[in-house]
A protein has these predicted regions:
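Edge beta-strand at a domain terminus
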Residues: 25-29, 80-91, 123-144
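Positively charged n-region of N-terminal signal peptides that target proteins for export
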Residues: 1-7
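N-terminal helix-cap/turn-to-beta initiation motif at the start of protein domains
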Residues: 26-45
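C-terminal motif of bacterial Sec signal peptides marking the signal peptidase cleavage site
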Residues: 16-19
Length: 144
């Protein structure tokens, strides 16, 4: 009887730990933050944009976000609300095409982010299917 209880306890603990790394929103340590950030460093330009404007997003080693809209005819640069704000990463939802992270901007706004086939994909829809966005040019950015 004692052996059976011990075995059940061990199996329960193993099953619990097996799902540990799939928790969305789980905080990541600084080494993991840096490893993830290194994938996204630099300025990224919207792939499929209107003729008159283009969105840019940037990631820096000091974890400060760059985001602006460039008006192509005039050259005017319009910064977003989150331009220059701090950011960090959390675990995101499962995706068959790549690893999705939750990008938390200024400890308020959460967006999903994934690098796939050399492009960056970003979207904000909560409870969405990442496979719908990753690979879709409407959500793609290329390194500038």
């Amino acid at each position: 009887m004692f052996v059976m209880r011990k075995l059940i306890f061990l199996l329960s603990a193993l099953l619990l730990c097996a799902g540990c790394d799939k928790n969305e929103g789980e905080p990541l340590d600084m080494a993991e933050q840096t490893r993830i950030n290194n994938q996204f460093l630099g300025l990224w330009q919207e792939v499929d944009h209107p003729r008159h404007q283009c969105k840019y997003r940037g990631f820096h080693s000091n974890f400060k976000y760059t985001s602006f809209l460039l008006m192509l005819h005039s050259g005017d640069k319009l910064p977003s609300t989150y331009d220059g704000k701090p950011y960090h990463f959390e675990k995101g939802p499962e995706c068959s095409k790549g690893t999705v992270y939750t990008l938390v901007l200024d400890n308020r706004l959460k967006e999903f982010i994934c690098k796939y086939n050399g492009l960056l994909y970003m979207w904000w829809q909560e409870n969405s299917d990442p496979d719908k966005y990753v690979g879709n040019p409407d959500y793609a950015y290329e390194r500038n």
